[in-house]
């Protein structure tokens, strides 16, 4: 796969994910009557800009994402801050003249509206993921894969330890299975090649506490698991496509959350973190396999970004929501100085993690170990 195609594919993916996120903030801010000073596609010098209904719309030279500038996003608390803000406006940092502004500053909007603005970006990431998955499910060949067992191989260990043909797999190890991939994901996480299944059998839920699976070893001595059963296909109707896409969105969202939880709990090594270099490499590989693999990776990235942004961590949208909830409960905003200190510390930590992940990416590229 050429470097040019990899870069183009990466630009498309990153731009789509970031632009849709910022569009979410922009749309809800507009609906809530909050002043949006600028909505930009791309970064860097402006190639084109126009003020329309109180907002400057701009197209910038670097086709990487975009941003939304909201009036009052950093609310002043002191006379010094107010003076600095007046100085910025005097220098025309705000692209919209005062007489053309149509909304109120963000910090003057009700708390609930500010919360909606903060979560709207992540929400649109989930929407993008869902739309992409609808396209993928509709375009796939054959039927939709179900979670209902069609047949079990002769003498398969899973059949001897509880599973039967006709069982609909509801959960594995206590985690609900939204799609067939959930079953595989949980079994891969099961190091002992055995798991607790919940199935629906003859209309009743049945607990199977110790379903075991056959294993085999390759010539390198690596142990692999044999599933030992096949499942029914589901007819591809518009409703079933939408249901499968919705359940797949939940599946990807849970993968993102579990991955983060595993990292915090130490189950997943921090050395496995991927940074920008690793993500671009993965995008290039997906693009080389075809448009469907690229779209699937786009869905995974945008849903992961949505989950990550909602974490209650300063510098992320979820952290801002926590500050707003505190303000709503106590009636007093968290001091701007404290917010700023926590946000700077959080940015420093995230930047450090990104550098560490980028270092890991480069080492993997050099050594060929992915």
Question: How should these model regions be labeled?
Answer:
Residues 3-92, 311-330:
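Small-residue-rich helix-interface/hinge motifs
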Residues 47-51, 148-152, 325-341, 368:
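Membrane interface segments of multi-pass transport proteins and intramembrane proteases
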Residues 5-13, 300, 346-353:
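Alpha-helical transmembrane segments of integral membrane proteins
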Residues 291-307:
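Small-residue-enriched transmembrane helix starts and helix-helix packing motifs
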Residues 356-370:
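Juxtamembrane boundary at the C-terminal end of a transmembrane helix
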Residues 262-266, 302-316:
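Transmembrane alpha-helix interface/packing and boundary motifs in multi-pass membrane proteins
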Residues 4, 78-120, 124-273, 370:
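PDZ peptide-recognition modules
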Residues 40, 65, 239-265, 277-280, ...:
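Membrane-interacting alpha-helical segments
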């Amino acid at each position: 796969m050429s470097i040019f195609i990899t870069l183009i594919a990466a630009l498309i993916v990153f731009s789509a994910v970031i632009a849709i996120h910022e569009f979410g903030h922009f749309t809800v801010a507009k609906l809530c009557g909050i002043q949006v000073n600028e909505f930009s596609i791309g970064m860097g010098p402006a190639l084109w800009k126009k003020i329309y209904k109180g907002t400057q719309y701009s197209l910038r030279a670097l086709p990487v994402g975009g941003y939304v500038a909201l009036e009052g996003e950093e609310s002043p608390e002191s006379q010094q801050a107010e003076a600095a803000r007046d100085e910025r406006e005097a220098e025309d940092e705000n692209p919209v003249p005062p007489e053309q502004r149509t909304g109120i500053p963000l910090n003057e909007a009700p708390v609930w509206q500010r919360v909606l603005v903060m979560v709207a970006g992540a929400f649109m990431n989930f929407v993008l993921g869902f739309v992409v998955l609808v396209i993928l499910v509709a375009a796939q060949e054959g039927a939709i894969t179900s979670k209902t067992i069609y047949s079990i191989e002769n003498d398969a260990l899973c059949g001897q330890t509880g599973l039967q043909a006709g069982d609909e797999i509801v959960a594995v190890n206590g985690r609900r299975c939204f799609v067939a991939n959930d079953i595989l994901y949980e079994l891969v996480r099961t190091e002992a090649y055995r798991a607790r299944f919940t199935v629906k059998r003859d209309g009743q839920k049945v607990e199977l506490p110790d379903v075991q699976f056959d294993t085999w070893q390759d010539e390198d001595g690596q142990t692999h698991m044999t599933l030992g059963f096949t499942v029914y296909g589901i007819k591809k109707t518009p409703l079933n496509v939408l249901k499968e896409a919705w359940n797949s969105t939940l599946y990807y969202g849970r993968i993102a959350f579990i991955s983060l939880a595993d990292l915090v709990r130490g189950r997943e090594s921090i050395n496995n973190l991927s940074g920008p270099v690793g993500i671009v490499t993965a995008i290039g590989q997906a693009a080389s396999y075809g448009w469907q693999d690229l779209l699937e990776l786009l869905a995974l990235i945008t849903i992961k970004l949505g989950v990550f942004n909602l974490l209650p961590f300063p510098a992320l949208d979820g952290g801002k929501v926590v500050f707003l909830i505190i303000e709503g409960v106590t009636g007093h905003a968290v001091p701007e100085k404290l917010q700023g200190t926590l946000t700077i510390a959080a940015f420093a930590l995230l930047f450090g993690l990104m550098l560490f992940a980028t270092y890991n990416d480069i080492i993997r590229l050099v050594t060929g170990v992915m």
